[in-house]
Amino acid sequence: MAAGALDDFQHAAALVLRTPTLIWIFLGGAMVTFAVNGLIAWGVSFMRRIHGFSVEDIGSNFGIWALAGGVLGALFGGRAADWLQQRWPGGRVFAAGAGFVLGGPVCVALIMVDDLRWFAPLVMATYFLYTWYNGPLAAVILDVVPPAVQASVLGAFVLFSHLAGDALAPPLIGYLSDRTGSLRTAMLLLPAVGVLGGAVILIALRTVGRDMSRVHA
């Protein structure tokens, strides 16, 4: 069974390297995963150290608003992606990448804001935009690979995005915080990488139509 799983992974990796859309999705997906999960990992420490929030404050000002924004963003992103896809082969790619390009400035505002009246709305807006990608990105992967290997390629994407993305974010932000003496400054890396990742995903707009046609030919 282990040998079969390894063979499946190797086949999935070879398919990724032969499919331009998947290359952009894998690279961009790792970057946006870095941004999202870095924000989650350091959010509590940020609010306690920068704003002096208590545990109760964090629950009401971060958890609830982030959850609400994330749920609404995932639903909106999926619906918008499907609506666009009916009119344009790049619809799902656009929805997956656009949320991070639009969300980058909002996340910067969240990190830099001192007026706490804006904090909860910015948390919700950031997570709303940062969760558009969840459904569309997986759907793009399924759109450009044969049905026989869809699960293997999707599994390879999840593995790659975690190893190259969110596994790196917490220690790197911690290191930069120690080096700069400012957690706020260190966390500005997250929206920067998120915008870059969104832009990399959007490069797949140039290739997704051709890759979809090849699968369905």
Regions found by a protein language model. Name each.
Residues 1-11, 212-217:
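Flexible cytoplasmic inter-helical loops of multi-pass small-molecule transporters
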Residues 18-77, 130-138, 142, 165-170:
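Extracytoplasmic gate region of multi-pass secondary transporters
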Residues 47-48, 80-81, 85, 172-181:
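Interfacial helix-cap and linker-helix signal at transmembrane-aqueous boundaries
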Residues 54, 91-94, 175-194:
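A membrane-interface helix-boundary motif in multi-pass transporters
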Residues 59, 96, 154-155:
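Membrane-interface helix-entry/capping residues at the boundaries of transmembrane alpha-helices
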Residues 74, 142-180:
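A late C-terminal transmembrane helix in Major Facilitator Superfamily
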Residues 89-137:
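C-terminal transmembrane helical hairpin of 12-TM major facilitator-type secondary transporters
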Residues 104-113, 188-217:
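Multi-pass alpha-helical transporter architecture, strongest
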